[in-house]
A protein has these predicted regions:
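Extended interfacial segments that mediate partner engagement and assembly in macromolecular machines
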Residues: 1-105, 123
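Short, solvent-exposed loop/turn elements at beta->coil junctions and helix N-caps
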Residues: 33-40, 106, 114-119, 385-389
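Short, low-complexity Ser/Thr-rich regulatory SLiMs
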Residues: 52-56, 120-122, 187, 388, ...
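Short, acidic/hydrophobic/Gly-rich beta-strand patch recurrent on exposed beta strands
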Residues: 63-66, 130-132, 286
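Internal alpha/beta scaffold segment
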Residues: 72-114, 134-156, 175-184
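Carbohydrate-binding surface patches
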Residues: 118-121, 126-137
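Rossmann-like S-adenosyl-L-methionine
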Residues: 136-143, 147-427
Length: 427
């Protein structure tokens, strides 16, 4: 399918779901904006995860799982990922042969190397290589891996060629110098399908890489959530910023804030931004990223939004000293997972009664469900903006602006007038 056809399909998908699930008609209940596509629909992913295994002949294979299975389809170069990934995979494969590092077998729970995670900073060109292992590497293997990374960075051969069967040409970098700023071993001892463990050991460079969304810098560790298409994420967030219509005085709540990507992006135009996220590590990252950028008008909380927000406003019913009445937020931003907003969170939004809601969605079906609820409880859907962040896939992001009605549906009073009993002739 051509990229133009993909964009047309995705915009229709959003419109159809809003109609079918939400009962919302394009051009009647809301304004549909033309989808924002990519300049280049390839090589846009800054993150790739490759399972590692062995084929029936004992050869090392790396690639992707076949649909709904754990059978690995060998693939060194996916056209959606960075072109340096294949160079790194080839080098790691040779290193495994050189140091006799076995792939992990999830059926018998034997072996060492489970996955290879590669992250790339598109604005900084920094690369992170993270090996997910069942146990910590032997010292000689770890030291050998560091030498491989140093050689990749220098543009020379990546192999130590210590075993008699090594083929130095298979791991030659062809003179291309990489910028691997972080080499991490993530240890996952659990016999589960969860990819990453909790323990990280940095073998080379920093425990993180850096990248930007707009002019906001982020530190990204193996465990960090970060948008996989940062260039198009900037397009998405600029649209969210436009819909928020901030003047510099508003109180903004970001109710699925993650590591603070949207919160920090909006903070430069807001009076105060509050982020809420249930994952403690994400909030730590958000606070660190705020400090990294010198942003002091953002505050982050761990917990469920409906609980955090209620407690916050009970403790701060008075003016906060800035001259802004903080008992009522001006804008709420939500960027939920594919399952959409929790029912209690939607209740919280209505109770908080913001002037505007900016809903960032990665699933137009659950978006339609949630918009139906909000439209029935005092909010008008103003604009719907599809954004393609994942070319050559079926996924589409959507940004929606909702505005509070001056009078909520439940506030209307029905009055019945019997004209037959009235004299309506002029005096």
């Amino acid at each position: 399918m051509s990229y133009a056809a993909q964009l047309k399909y995705k915009q229709k998908l959003v419109s159809d779901n809003l109609q079918r699930i939400g009962g919302l008609t394009e051009g009647v209940d809301y304004e549909m904006c033309d989808i924002l596509g990519m300049d280049t629909p390839f090589r846009y992913r800054n993150k790739a995860q490759y399972p590692v295994g062995e084929d029936k002949d004992g050869n090392i294979i790396m690639g992707f799982y076949a649909g709904h299975t754990h059978s690995i389809i060998p693939c060194d170069d996916c056209l959606l990922g960075d072109e340096n990934n294949s160079v790194i995979l080839t080098a790691v494969r040779q290193w495994m042969k050189d140091y006799r590092v076995r792939a992990y077998n999830e059926n018998i729970h034997k072996g060492t190397l489970r996955h290879i995670l590669i992250r790339t900073g598109f604005h900084t060109d920094e690369i992170m290589v993270c090996l997910v292992t069942k146990k910590m590497l032997r010292k000689e293997a770890a030291d050998g891996l560091v030498r491989v990374i140093e050689r990749l960075n220098s543009g020379s051969s990546a192999s130590d060629n210590i075993s008699s069967g090594s083929d130095n040409n298979t791991s030659n970098n062809s003179g291309r110098k990489l910028n691997i700023a972080s080499l991490v071993v993530n240890i996952n001892k659990e016999d589960t399908n969860v990819i990453l463990g909790r323990e990280c050991v940095t073998l080379y460079g920093r425990p993180y890489i850096e990248d930007y969304i707009g002019d906001i810098k982020f530190q990204i560790s193996p465990l960090s959530f970060f948008q996989v298409n940062p260039k198009q994420t900037e397009v998405l967030y600029n649209k969210a910023l436009e819909f928020a219509n901030l003047t510099g005085n508003e109180a903004v709540w970001d109710l699925y804030c993650g590591i603070g990507t949207i919160s920090l992006f909006l903070a430069k135009n807001a009076g105060m931004v509050y982020g809420v996220e249930i994952v403690p590590q994400a909030i730590e990252d958000a606070k660190n990223n705020a400090g990294l950028n010198g942003i002091d008008n953002a505050e982050f909380f761990v917990g469920k939004a409906e609980e955090v927000v209620t407690a916050f406003y009970e403790s701060r019913k008075a003016d906060d000293g800035t001259g802004h009445n903080m008992t009522r937020p001006d804008v709420i931003v939500v960027d939920p997972p594919r399952k959409g907003c929790d029912e209690k969170l939607l209740d919280t939004i209505v109770t908080m009664s913001p002037q505007r809601v900016v809903y960032v969605s990665c699933d137009s079906a659950t978006l339609a469900r949630d918009l139906k609820v909000l439209s029935e409880r005092g909010y008008k859907i103003v604009k719907v903006q599809p954004v393609d962040q994942f070319a050559n896939t079926v996924h589409v992001e959507t940004v929606v602006l909702l505005s509070q009605l001056k009078q909520k549906p439940d506030d209307y009073i029905n009055v019945t007038i019997e004209f037959d009993d009235m004299d309506i002739t002029s005096a």
